Amino acid sequence: MNSITLGPLSKANGEIQIPGSKSLSNRILLLATLAKGTTKITNLLDSDDIRRMLESLTKLGVSYSLEDNGTTCVLEGLGGPIQADFGDLFLGNAGTAMRPLTAALCLGKGEFLLHGEPRMHERPIGDLVDALQALGVDITYEGEKNYPPLRIKANGLSGGEVSIKGNISSQFLTAILMSAPLAKSDLTIKVDGELVSKPYIDITLHAMKQFGVEVENQNYQAFVVKGQQTYQSPGEIMVEGDASSASYFLAAAAIAGGKIKVHGVGTDSVQGDVKFADVLAQMGAKITYGPSWIEAERNELNGIDMDMNHIPDAAMTIATTALFAKGPTTIRNIYNWRVKETDRLYAMATELKKLGADVIEGKDFITVTPVANLKHAAIDTYNDHRIAMCFSLVAFSDTPVTINDPGCTSKTFPTYFELFNTIAN
């Protein structure tokens, strides 16, 4: 296994243009597929998860061309459901492709097999399958119940009313929302229990609106969608920068001294993870916002105790930022870390302890208490892009850090370590 060693580094300075949002890229690709008309998508993320979606669309007969090193996609919409008769789709570990495609493929008439990497077959999908079965879909598990691989025999999606659990992943609700306008009749989706990661549902609703479909949102407890609609291509659409990816650079400035301006996200962003900068500000960092940029500057950081369910991915960056704060930091209501690319609560706690930090790992929280001197450690990344990027920040201590398998960042940010080197002094 290859590794890289970073630091020790003293300052972080510069300006960064972050790549397109993973969450938005895969949502927009699917909506453009179902829409009437040709869509030109710019600032598309060029990464493994997006390639898995594009490869699947190719197998399903969707026509598109890529330009600008894969960051511009011109896609011919189908003006309705996917018409393929059969598809054997390998989706890697891309939840943003697996979940929405599972629902969208139910709209047509074919037979489809959806599978992925071993970790994908450990990530639950039962709540989504239960909801689709309640809407009349013939969908079965090829392996263990509640987990992929899945086999779908599609015959359209009936309307009516369906309940879906909201406490594991908002992607299950996103999947049904995006397919609901093409259902045979109006659909009311009721959320059973607390809905995690509400900002990701806002991303979905915003993207649907860009393609001409409005959803009645009843305080995130129910959603009403008219059936037998057709998405309309907006012609050209730009994917905003990935707010989770911005978090590492903003945190670097807050930790290290210097000033970093991140372009691609700001006050105009639809992503909830831009609120990460507010958390940094509460810890003491100097933060300035523009419509499409955020700037961070160092100040003395203090530990915080906070519910971070609204920024689950970016909250991981707070766990390593906590190493540089005064006093303990507790990140709460993050059970869904456990069903991501790896069990992130376990992974973060394990690797932080290697550095010498005092860590408490709860069922749905983590407490990190910093120590005066961090240990040099080799950080295992669990094939999880965000673990690798989070722990790069340790390089701004007095101790170098070794990151094992740094190539795992190809899932969402293949050029991360190149850009990291441009801001590091």
Swiss-Prot record:
Enzyme class, broadest EC rank: transferase
Disulfide-bond pairs as recorded: none
Pathway: Metabolic intermediate biosynthesis; chorismate biosynthesis; chorismate from D-erythrose 4-phosphate and phosphoenolpyruvate: step 6/7
Active site as annotated: D313
The keyword Glycosyltransferase is annotated on this UniProt entry: no
Function (record text): Catalyzes the transfer of the enolpyruvyl moiety of phosphoenolpyruvate (PEP) to the 5-hydroxyl of shikimate-3-phosphate (S3P) to produce enolpyruvyl shikimate-3-phosphate and inorganic phosphate.
Protein name as it appears in the record: 3-phosphoshikimate 1-carboxyvinyltransferase
Gene: aroA
